[in-house]
């Protein structure tokens, strides 16, 4: 029992270390120096770049139109056709707030916009200025029962008609942004499509218990998914040539991503402007030649919304990896599927967490039973082991040999009680990242005072109950500890971890509390069986 408790203590500390280490790697980014923040409002329809062809920032402002379906409301600037605002209609800005969550925005405090255009020899989005599109109407809304809403923005120059067509579909956060180019000029033209996400340079935020990453990410033919933080952008510009792929900006629970034509050759890039305190991640395609009299359509998609794994996987390969479970993904993914399955049945995410706990504990029950049986046998051997310690004294080699001989004779595995604890470590870490990354748990209520399972318990009731359950579990297996210092550590361990869990998401604390209560029930059941065999009663003294 001593070794089991020690291992549990070390396991929890190890889990804490792994979580802290991952937080340091992904989130503890030095904050860049703020310079000329007042100039951020000048960006508006800006293309941020150091190259000579993609448009630079401009003071001019176009007309702003609104596009809306049943899940988001978008603001589009007719100067350049950039998406400069998005409101997610099914997500509250704050708990119990009636205001929708704002993802894309462009104001004096924060810039986060999705830009796209045409550069190159005959591009209309050069440094000299952006295309000033014309459109009839100001508000375009997908009607109930309508399968598709197309909103064309039109611009004409030198005999060429450029249509930037936005396509919205019901229930989808994927916005099609297509260029339809009709060349009525006497000569061929050449354009280079590009798209980028521009964001105010910020550091990742959150606490050690609930860290959040804000920064870039991309996918290429060589790399399924890789983060590229704002600090990385400031150190070196990204320059990757690939077929297919995508670029994205991530934040807690939400993501915006440009997905180019997956059959085209693209260059993924990043750019920073420290003067205006901005960073961009984007792509540009290979030049496209349009003969006179011909029409060419260039397809691209913009995802701007929550990290919904199933929907994102349908939009682009590996886009669902923006729900980042770290190294425990192979456990977290099936756990999340199980969690959503149970939630669909019980219609409560808190009950679903308890359901997942029941399944996990049921799977581990044979090992748990073996653990307590092994512990009971080990306690039976304590008098003989104590006798060996007194007999062999300082002769540790002889004592070890005799102990191994005794274990073999009694068919006892001294490490038999460790396996369930070791198996629970990666499960706990996987659940931590599942609860951290799942937007489905954002503002999801349980019962009573727990109105948001993704946030800490506001009254710390769950952590206190968890600490009490650990204390009860400890008292159910009383074993004297020889070392007084170790005895004190073990006595205070429930209190230590109660304090440790005070600021963890309520969903994670609920899992640990449910796990402890189920373990108490399992332990009582197992001990009853051991008493019938005469094992438990013989060692309780």
Curated annotation (Swiss-Prot):
Gene3D superfamilies: 2.70.98.90
Record's keyword terms, sorted: Cell inner membrane, Cell membrane, Chaperone, Membrane, Protein transport, Transmembrane, Transmembrane helix, Transport
The UniProt record lists the keyword Transport: yes
Subunit structure: Interacts with the Sec translocase complex via SecD. Specifically interacts with transmembrane segments of nascent integral membrane proteins during membrane integration.
Family: Belongs to the OXA1/ALB3/YidC family. Type 1 subfamily.
Alphabetized HAMAP family for the sequence: YidC_type1
Name of this protein: Membrane protein insertase YidC
Organism whose genome encodes this protein: Histophilus somni (strain 129Pt) (Haemophilus somnus)
Primary gene name: yidC
